[in-house]
Amino acid sequence: MALATNINDLLNKQKIESNRIEFKKGWNPASIYHSICAFANDFDDLGGGYIIVGVNTDDKTGMAIRPVEGVPIEKIDGILQEMVGYNSRITPYYLPRTSIEEVDGRRLIVIWCPAGSYRPYSVPVNVTAKGTKEYYYIRSG
């Protein structure tokens, strides 16, 4: 699926407020799904947000470090398949949009999380384990 904005604008935090962009070095389902849920809840009506997997950040500025690290191409299909299962753990059902983008010769997984229509959303603390308590996540600031 095509992104609603340019990947370089996201990496440079241009045209989109920085609190709507989250960079992740690697695939960590629990952390990523907490963020997906928070963007879907979007109580400030900012338009949701973007999670970009495969990007290191500068600890001082929060900006993307270039060239990006990327996600190994052999892991992308597996991650997308995992997401299909994890998406069903969000209550009520919510489907983020994903796009694979090439930057600096490497691939990134971009997860676009528009504001959901059936807020509030909750997700288990650990989407990879059964029987974990669900929480509502929101973004602030």
Which residues fall in each region the model found?
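Conserved N-terminal catalytic/coupling substructures associated with nucleotide/phosphate chemistry
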Residues: M1-G141
